[in-house]
Amino acid sequence: MDPAAAGIVKEEMLESQQQQRQEDGGAAPRPMEGLHEVGPPPFLTKTYDLVEDPATDGVVSWSRAGNSFVVWDPHVFADLLLPRLFKHNNFSSFVRQLNTYGFRKVDPDRWEFANEGFLRGQRHLLKTIKRRKPPSNAPPSQQQSLTSCLEVGEFGFEEEIDRLKRDKNILITEVVKLRQEQQATKDHVKAMEDRLRAAEQKQVQMMGFLARAMRNPEFFQQLAQQKEKRKELEDAISKKRRRPIDNVPFYDPGETSQTEQLDSPYLFDSGVLNELSEPGIPELENLAVNIQDLGKGKVDEERQNQTNGQAELGDDFWAELLVEDFTGKEEQSELDGKIDGIDELAQQLGYLSSTSPK
């Protein structure tokens, strides 16, 4: 083949190809629409599918307006649903992820989150949700701290305050209870100290009493005599038989009661009194009245001794015994003085009866 002819054929083929290209210029192959576009993150798509699933409406679902979703049961959501989609069961981590994509908490009393691109029935808007990036000039540790503070401030701050208030009220109640118990314990300790101090004082008094008793050999003898005297007085009063006084001319019946006449230990024979009560002898009447009064005083003293004898030997008796320093001898001298007074009255009575005119 002639080389010149071959060159001509080649040029014609090139021209035809070039002309065909010019004719098919508008129908050249192009890439698919949206082929190089970036889709929504897997976290958003999984969360959207989870909220859209009607089988999980008891745990998580859309709100009535459809512009937010509500986690009704965080515990079941974290235990069952999160491990199935996100391979973890940390609800706080899920909330942190929502925070990084710009979700906000709508209701402080429940876990309700909203975003302008997260709407019911509009899945295509998920691509408008962008992940927030921290400033590039800040260190990673500071970025993490800012994220944590933002999460606590927006999503957990109210619940944390409520929990702290409850803990504070519980602690205040416990402190008040402990203070009451402390005051009761102080009062009990003070009462025990008072009782211990009183017991120590009694012990000191008892030791002093025993020391004085050992230094005084007559003490036990005097104590035994005193007890014997009391016993004799009790026996004498219980066995004494009184005779009623008959007509006494120098006593007014209105002045002396029958009980006083029966209580008198000095009872006189009516015949003797009639002999002594002659006209013109007023001294006999006065002496008889004095003797009667003296007898009443003696009965009162015996009754008082009986009462004291029946009482127990308490602290007052020992204190009186220690202070008076065994005054048994003085009581004996007083008793002798009373007997001497009675003898003197009897002598005067005999003198007057002997000198009275016949």
Curated annotation (Swiss-Prot):
Residues 1-39 are annotated as: Disordered. A motif (AHA2) lies at residues 315-324. Gene3D superfamilies: Winged helix-like DNA-binding domain superfamily/Winged helix DNA-binding domain. A motif (Nuclear export signal) lies at residues 345-352. Residues 156-243 form a coiled coil. Transmembrane segments: none annotated. A motif (AHA1) lies at residues 265-274. It is found in: Cytoplasm; Nucleus. It comes from the Eukaryota. Induction: By heat stress. GO terms for cellular component: cytoplasm; nucleus. Residues 164-214 are annotated as: Hydrophobic repeat HR-A/B. GO terms for molecular function: DNA-binding transcription factor activity; identical protein binding; sequence-specific DNA binding. Keywords: Activator, Coiled coil, Cytoplasm, DNA-binding, Nucleus, Phosphoprotein, Stress response, Transcription, Transcription regulation. SMART domains: HSF. Expressed in roots, leaves and immature seeds. Its main location: cytoplasm. A motif (Bipartite nuclear localization signal) lies at residues 229-243. Homotrimer. PANTHER family: HEAT SHOCK TRANSCRIPTION FACTOR, HEAT STRESS TRANSCRIPTION FACTOR A-2C. Belongs to the HSF family. Class A subfamily. The hydrophobic-rich region (HR-A/B) corresponds to the oligomerization domain. AHA motifs are transcriptional activator elements. Transcriptional activator that specifically binds DNA of heat shock promoter elements (HSE). This is Heat stress transcription factor A-2c. It comes from Oryza sativa subsp. japonica (Rice).
